[in-house]
């Protein structure tokens, strides 16, 4: 995202809600329609049995009739369309929309964490049971939130986190404000480096600190002062050093890269996931397909920025760069999809208000995907890129019982995914 900034007030009311939402463990779920995301076929009258200890599915079978006196750990969704919990592969849950970067100079990690708790709850209730959070300015806020959710202290989606950005001085991952260059506090410059050896050390720091993946800023950014989206920032040598270090432990590396050259350099350096990919060219598309690299193309938020940017306090520089990248990114999304490149669902939540994640589905279908392909991008394909393809993304025996339910068929109307009626994560109904 890298980034205009965020509102740090107006969160206290939600903190209580995020940390104390009541949930109920389920052992049997009766789904009138259950989507097989591989085939696109709806199974009728599916009974999902859940192991209450592991939160995983024991069995998916059929039922003839739903009992009129179900126990409290059974759920009747016989009039609903059920599908796997959704996965957003590009979020910034600890941040809210605003336009004043200077606030990052004084906000504490505790204040940032309060914002994250509120947004985690909102995101889960929108049907997203897993997110890949791809960077925070206040280092390790995301890890603390992840751990609270795992411990059931806080309500939210399953989180995979980056810890902090790896970026060059003054790059797209820096909070650099004209006139305040000398005032940037050290605690929001944890991932700033220059040179292959320095970036290797930063990668070690991310890994040893307990992050799930590494996020590096290979190109300039739309929402950062003086940073040009089409221009490379990290060198191939710097990127390679990070990838080499990551390979030692099997941790995955994803690269923020708008520009065509940056995308190709990142792929050739061994990165397996590209964020944004706005200006990707034909050679980059071919390289991505050949090397099994996934693209996370946030094709919704350009409209939000264009419509609300001034209200949110964004400077004209950011708005201009957004105008220059929005439509070309959508055209390249269509080209990459037609070429058979793996595209995952990722929205850059935090650029727009959290909870609106599902609005991106209709943009993906407008620009070349079928409804089923867009759903697959947010389920089975995303789980593959996360390395969790045997745990999430499908409603099958042995998988976590992550299930959402809605009243209308999303294969007919993709916007149905913007109105989720029930959210179940690891067998818990929220």
Q: Positions of the model-derived regions?
A:
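Metal-associated gating/positioning segment near the N- to mid-region
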Residues: 80-147, 151-153, 169-170, 237, ...
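Bacterial Sec-dependent N-terminal signal peptides
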Residues: 1-25
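Divalent metal-dependent hydrolysis catalytic cores, especially in the metallo-beta-lactamase
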Residues: 116-140, 155-165, 211-222, 252, ...
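Histidine-rich, glycine-flanked metal-binding segment
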Residues: 27, 34, 38-83
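Active-site gating loops and adjacent loop-to-helix segments of metal-dependent hydrolytic enzymes
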Residues: 95-112, 172-188, 222-235, 294-326
